[in-house]
Amino acid sequence: MLTVAIAKGRLLKSFITYLKQANEQELVDALEKRERQLLISVGSIQIVLVKGSDVPIYVEQGVADVGIVGSDILEEGNYTINNLVDLPFGDCHFALAAKPETSSFNKIATSYVKTARAYFEAQGIDVELVKLSGSIELACLVEMVDGIVDIVQTGTTLKSNGLVEKDTIKPINAKLITNKQSYFKKSSEIDAFLSTLEVSLIDHR
């Protein structure tokens, strides 16, 4: 049995869409009919659905053999895992966003402090960073901050809140990570799972 931790939300939706394109209907059916289940078994695979930021922790602790998680999560943390390969779904990007009239930034809200700090340091701009867990756009709307650094996929949320993208910071994509021991002990199972995803590890071992 190979245990796979997958981030709920945006990435899970992208994963299901990709599985449909790969004609992996058994996995698609199990994920779409899960209701509130967090543990799903399909053949020799057990899927664990967790919060994105928890995926590398489940993998690091050995509860999950492999994980599917956004590169944004990995860049913000420091985990003892194998970061194996990019996956062909889940593409989006980090962006600096603000009201259209805003041209200078002194105070920024974000859930991604490490990424935001690196961006502004590279720009030579000294800003105060306010860490928030959700509804980042609101901080800009109530003028608590001058702008936000957040993940943008379609831009719909920004537009609906009267915000615009001021700069694209860096791309984000889905990554396959593995537990360090599982990487060797379950190499054949991992290869079989990646074959399902039409991804090869030939260049990564």
UniProtKB/Swiss-Prot annotation:
One of its GO terms (biological process) is L-histidine biosynthetic process. GO terms for cellular component: cytoplasm. Pathway: Amino-acid biosynthesis; L-histidine biosynthesis; L-histidine from 5-phospho-alpha-D-ribose 1-diphosphate: step 1/9. It is found in: Cytoplasm. Its EC number is 2.4.2.17. Its main location: cytoplasm. It is an enzyme of class 2 (transferase). Belongs to the ATP phosphoribosyltransferase family. Short subfamily. This is ATP phosphoribosyltransferase. It comes from Staphylococcus saprophyticus subsp. saprophyticus (strain ATCC 15305 / DSM 20229 / NCIMB 8711 / NCTC 7292 / S-41).
